[in-house]
């Protein structure tokens, strides 16, 4: 759990200074910390409870349950209101039904039946609102807020205000994007 990522980062950075393998943590200059972990089983996501993160990266996202990702991103936050917090999901197409949630999250880019499919470019930001089990996508935060205001039971923060709309984008990757893999039998 996490060992391969530590090895890969060591290759990228040129050394493993600051890496603590047993804890799967990499202490970087200026007090920064990279923590590697996993969620092999349902319930494993709970070990990340209460640990604020300004970036969460998930490799092989379709191998996770949607509920695990939704739980972990509850801790995607910063005490600094100017700090950008980000979630990055990297994955191949789903190989099981449990991974199909990823297609819903990125439907405007990957689902030909979605009304926005073909009109949004890779990397273009859309704002989304989760209404029940359905993601609704909008071209601006104002459109997303307007939608929330019209919902019968809109989501509310603890102070009663509407949450700030969140953005999402999708960038397709191909084998040709990685020359190191082209030279192998990966594809």
Feature roles, as predicted:
Residues 1-187:
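Phosphate/NTP-binding elements of NTP-utilizing enzymes
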């Amino acid at each position: 759990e996490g060992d391969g990522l530590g090895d890969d980062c060591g290759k990228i950075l040129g050394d493993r200074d600051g890496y603590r393998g047993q804890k799967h943590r990499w202490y970087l200059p200026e007090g920064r910390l990279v923590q590697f972990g996993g969620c092999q089983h349902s319930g494993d996501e709970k070990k990340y409870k209460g640990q604020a993160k300004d970036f969460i990266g998930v490799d092989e996202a379709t191998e996770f349950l949607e509920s695990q990702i939704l739980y972990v991103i509850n801790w995607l936050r910063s005490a600094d209101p100017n700090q950008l917090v980000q979630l990055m999901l990297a994955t191949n197409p789903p190989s099981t039904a449990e991974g199909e949630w990823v297609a819903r999250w990125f439907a405007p880019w990957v689902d030909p039946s979605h009304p926005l499919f073909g009109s949004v470019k890779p990397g273009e930001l859309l704002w989304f609102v989760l209404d029940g089990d359905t993601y609704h996508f909008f071209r601006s935060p104002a459109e997303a807020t307007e939608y929330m205001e019209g919902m019968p039971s809109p989501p509310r923060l603890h102070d009663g205000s509407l949450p700030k709309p969140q953005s999402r984008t999708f960038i397709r990757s191909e084998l040709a994007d990685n020359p190191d893999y082209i030279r192998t039998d990966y594809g």
